[in-house]
């Protein structure tokens, strides 16, 4: 994949950097692997907003992805690499020798015609899936299961990869993209290689309208609201917060307050916590 930068012919193209989609080999998805998807728009089953700044956006059809890789010991071949509007990673259409078709996440380095297979004793090649206990130390993996047979739950984003760093009894230690080291049961499946389309981190939407196409609505700072709408609101002009620190719209302390539950069941499986980011991310905005 490559990226394409635009000249500033208009304000919307001044900062625009997008994928060139050179790796896409098919424009129409496989109809048998499509299902309709209802957009929740940030609402729960009662219609109450549980996630702000969501709504609108282009209609999408969900592509059924094979995260389980449970078609064991049946060779398959990648026949196309496609765009998926529901994720940053590309997806690959696989034809298996028994005639079945499935979508998988496209690993970095594969192309049309690459053979893949899933099983306990498969070759250590990009795109193949196998239990963690059979993967050599130092190998890069993605689409990792946390519960055997449930399907991959972590390391699925574009460009993401984990590394097998140790094997201890019934567990395998993985170094995750966040630098956290976590123990996973040895019988859990993982796919060899990293997820493709890593250059997506270098892209830029360029204008607010493209954000709306993705279903993201504007985020209004609390300091420009009225006191009835946000604890930061009110005052004359650009007034300070008036508190010891920033808070959420519901008065809970923000920016630095730990949100992970104490005595969580998975605490015993985490050997090393992820390091704190030196840069302030989305949470650094005036909530």
Swiss-Prot record:
PROSITE patterns: RIBOSOMAL_L2. Keywords: Ribonucleoprotein, Ribosomal protein, RNA-binding, rRNA-binding. It holds the Pfam family Ribosomal_L2_C. PANTHER family: LARGE RIBOSOMAL SUBUNIT PROTEIN UL2M (PTHR13691:SF5), RIBOSOMAL PROTEIN L2 (PTHR13691). Belongs to the universal ribosomal protein uL2 family. HAMAP family: Ribosomal_uL2_B (MF_01320_B). This is Large ribosomal subunit protein uL2. It comes from Synechococcus sp. (strain ATCC 27144 / PCC 6301 / SAUG 1402/1) (Anacystis nidulans).
């Amino acid at each position: 994949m490559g990226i394409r930068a635009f000249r500033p012919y208009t304000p919307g193209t001044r900062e625009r950097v997008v994928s060139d989609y050179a790796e896409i080999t098919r424009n129409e998805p496989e109809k048998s692997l499509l299902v309709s998807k209802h957009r929740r728009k940030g609402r729960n089953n009662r219609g109450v907003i549980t996630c702000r700044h969501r709504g609108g956006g282009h209609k999408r059809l969900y592509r059924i992805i094979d995260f389980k890789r449970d078609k064991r010991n049946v060779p398959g071949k990648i026949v196309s690499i496609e765009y998926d509007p529901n994720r940053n990673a590309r997806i690959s259409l696989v034809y298996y020798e028994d005639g079945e078709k499935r979508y998988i996440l496209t690993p970095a380095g594969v192309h049309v015609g690459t053979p893949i297979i899933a099983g306990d004793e498969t070759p250590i090649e990009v795109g193949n899936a196998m239990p963690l206990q059979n993967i050599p130390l130092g190998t890069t993996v993605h689409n990792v299961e946390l519960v055997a047979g449930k399907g991959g739950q972590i390391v699925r984003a574009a460009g993401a990869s984990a590394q097998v760093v140790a094997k201890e009894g019934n567990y395998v230690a993985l170094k995750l993209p966040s630098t956290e080291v976590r123990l996973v049961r040895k019988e859990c499946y993982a796919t060899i290689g990293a997820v493709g389309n890593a250059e997506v981190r270098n892209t830029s939407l360029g204008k607010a309208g493209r954000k709306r196409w993705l279903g993201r609505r504007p985020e209004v700072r609390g300091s420009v609201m009225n006191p009835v709408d946000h604890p930061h609101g009110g005052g004359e002009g650009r007034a300070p917060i008036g508190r010891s620190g920033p808070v959420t719209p519901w008065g809970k302390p923000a920016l630095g307050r730990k949100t992970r539950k104490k005595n969580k069941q998975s605490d015993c499986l985490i050997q090393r916590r992820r390091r704190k980011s030196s840069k302030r991310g989305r949470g650094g905005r005036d909530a």
